[in-house]
Curated annotation (Swiss-Prot):
Naturally occurring in which organism (per UniProt): Mus musculus
Name by which UniProt lists this protein: DNA damage-inducible transcript 4 protein
Keywords: Antiviral defense, Apoptosis, Cytoplasm, Mitochondrion, Phosphoprotein, Ubl conjugation
GO BP annotation list: brain development; cellular response to dexamethasone stimulus; defense response to virus; intracellular signal transduction; intrinsic apoptotic signaling pathway in response to DNA damage by p53 class mediator; negative regulation of glycolytic process; negative regulation of TOR signaling; neuron differentiation
PTM summary: Phosphorylated by GSK3B; this promotes proteasomal degradation. Polyubiquitinated by a DCX (DDB1-CUL4A-RBX1) E3 ubiquitin-protein ligase complex with BTRC as substrate-recognition component, leading to its proteasomal degradation.
Function: Regulates cell growth, proliferation and survival via inhibition of the activity of the mammalian target of rapamycin complex 1 (mTORC1). Inhibition of mTORC1 is mediated by a pathway that involves DDIT4/REDD1, AKT1, the TSC1-TSC2 complex and the GTPase RHEB. Plays an important role in responses to cellular energy levels and cellular stress, including responses to hypoxia and DNA damage. Regulates p53/TP53-mediated apoptosis in response to DNA damage via its effect on mTORC1 activity.
Superkingdom: Eukaryota
Amino acid sequence: MPSLWDRFSSSSSSSSSSRTPAADRPPRSAWGSAAREEGLDRCASLESSDCESLDSSNSGFGPEEDSSYLDGVSLPDFELLSDPEDEHLCANLMQLLQESLSQARLGSRRPARLLMPSQLVSQVGKELLRLAYSEPCGLRGALLDVCVEQGKSCHSVAQLALDPSLVPTFQLTLVLRLDSRLWPKIQGLLSSANSSLVPGYSQSLTLSTGFRVIKKKLYSSEQLLIEEC
């Protein structure tokens, strides 16, 4: 799949100049590739565990401590964020995300087209901008892992990087959920062992508007920040 940065480099250059000069970019090192591998491992490990346990197991806090920790985290109001470049990149990222979801494979036998409601697209975009606001390279420094929660397991769908030439400075794991009203459809999709594959997509499934984003700074030892929406 062509990188998002290559596809939109011409339009991005006209919006504004880069937030961080090339000389200020983080040095390329082994942790850049290690971050990508870690993101894939995180999504893979979720496939055999309850996604809800991710909040406590990764943060190092119990339910009460974790809640109080998040209460103390201060993020800027979205109205105060005004970065034309990041907003432009975010719109392109959401387009690439929807394309990746339209080619998702939840089960091992049949593909499915996962659809994001417009409300979900808007909410995810705003949350990514909020989490990227304090980063040295903004949204360009993000490595986005996309997972879809199904019952007590998660399926890794995609890993997206806005600028593959830039060593990522922070990692976001986006956990989406299937609409619970579609359970009969989902069960039929995953249990169709004897049905043969046909070209195209057998099912179109709508995602719930609820989601979770887990942020990890790759240049810091800070605790994971978990945003539940």
